[in-house]
């Protein structure tokens, strides 16, 4: 219960107000978490409205199953499965899709989940601990090159190569020291390599982010769900995405811009602008948490919300 109480949904009112344009529509919450956005959406829906939520985390599913509302259903899967999951439920078009990306406070705050370097725990990092390869299992087999690429590309860590070498060197000592399987030891290894310090940021922050993104295929799944959302949105439907770091936000920004712009055509070709297909999206706005929200919930500081609307059938 403590974790449930500590979780604060970021940009709650702003997201739901931007999302729900038709109270009798069908909406998707791609990241149920602990249900903050879902409950607020349900409060705005009419009796004919419908909300379908997704989450990989078994604990989120347990929370969702406690919502007794005929308009609500939960899917225990990644939002990357959205297109097929909705088709299986007879849903062809939706009035809005909400994505609240990243890891939730209850996941970070529970040492047993292995997301945080602040308290020692098993090196897991999976959103769904029942599926796929854990962080410890991946670290036990990844090459220096693969480690470097993941830590560099997903963590934007300039010491990626040095960290990768240190991790492989530690693996060579597994017969004597045992496997690298705790968050505390991983943070310690990274801390010994990263000599410079960013103000207010633990030296392991970027590496933990990178490994978590890789283990959960977060950026690949994000691209899949953005494409799915575009195809599922009815005319006038909204796509609302809240991201918490530059890698996510860059993907969302480029996706929305690409689909809100007319196709590029060589000016030498005899094609009139009026003959080109209209872009499917219109960018509505970009919003940030208020100073008051950041003061009450420091984890909201890095959040950015982007909103786009489908303008073509």
Curated annotation (Swiss-Prot):
GO terms for biological process, alphabetical:
rRNA base methylation
> Under the cellular component aspect of Gene Ontology, which terms does the record hold?
cytoplasm
Tell whether DNA-binding is among the UniProt keywords: no
Q: Out of the domains of life, which is the source?
A: Bacteria
Q: Which segments cross the bilayer?
A: none
- Catalytic reactions on record: cytidine(1402) in 16S rRNA + S-adenosyl-L-methionine = N(4)-methylcytidine(1402) in 16S rRNA + S-adenosyl-L-homocysteine + H(+)
The family database entries (InterPro entries) matched by this protein are listed as: RsmH, SAM-dep_MeTrfase_MraW_recog, SAM-dependent_MTases_sf
> Principal place where this protein is found?
cytoplasm
The cross-references to Gene3D superfamilies, in alphabetical order and at most eight, read: Putative methyltransferase TM0872, insert domain, Vaccinia Virus protein VP39
Which EC number(s) does UniProt give? 2.1.1.199
GO MF assignments: rRNA (cytosine-N4-)-methyltransferase activity
Q: What does this chain do?
A: Specifically methylates the N4 position of cytidine in position 1402 (C1402) of 16S rRNA.
Q: What is this protein called?
A: Ribosomal RNA small subunit methyltransferase H
Native organism: Burkholderia cenocepacia (strain HI2424)
Its gene name is rsmH
């Amino acid at each position: 219960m403590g974790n449930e109480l500590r979780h604060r949904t970021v940009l709650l009112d702003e997201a739901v107000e931007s999302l729900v344009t038709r109270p009798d529509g069908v909406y998707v919450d791609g990241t149920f978490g602990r249900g903050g956005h879902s409950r607020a959406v349900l409060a705005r829906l009419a009796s004919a409205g419908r909300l379908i939520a997704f989450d990989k985390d078994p604990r989120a599913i347990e929370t969702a199953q406690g919502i007794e509302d005929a308009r609500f259903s939960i899917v225990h899967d990644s939002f990357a499965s959205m297109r097929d999951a909705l088709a299986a439920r007879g849903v062809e078009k939706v009035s809005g899709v909400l994505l609240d990306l990243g890891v939730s406070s209850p996941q970070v705050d529970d040492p047993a989940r292995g997301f945080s370097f602040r308290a020692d725990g098993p090196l897991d990092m999976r959103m769904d601990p029942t599926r796929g390869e854990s962080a410890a299992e991946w670290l036990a087999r990844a090459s220096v090159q693969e480690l470097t690429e993941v830590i560099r590309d997903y963590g934007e860590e300039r010491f990626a190569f040095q960290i990768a070498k240190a991790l492989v060197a530690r693996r060579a000592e597994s017969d004597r020291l045992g496997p690298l399987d705790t968050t505390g030891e991983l943070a310690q290894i990274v801390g010994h390599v990263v000599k410079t310090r960013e103000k207010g940021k633990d030296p392991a922050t970027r590496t933990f982010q990178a490994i978590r993104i890789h283990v959960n295929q977060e950026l690949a799944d994000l691209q899949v769900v953005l494409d799915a959302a575009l195809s599922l949105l009815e005319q006038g439907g909204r796509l609302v995405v809240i991201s918490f770091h530059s890698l996510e936000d860059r993907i969302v920004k480029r996706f929305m811009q690409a689909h809100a712009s007319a196709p590029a055509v060589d000016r030498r070709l005899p094609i009139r602008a009026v003959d080109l297909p209209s872009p499917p999206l219109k960018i509505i706005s970009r919003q940030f948490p208020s100073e008051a929200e950041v003061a009450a919930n420091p984890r909201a500081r890095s959040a950015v919300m982007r909103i786009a609307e489908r303008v073509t059938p």
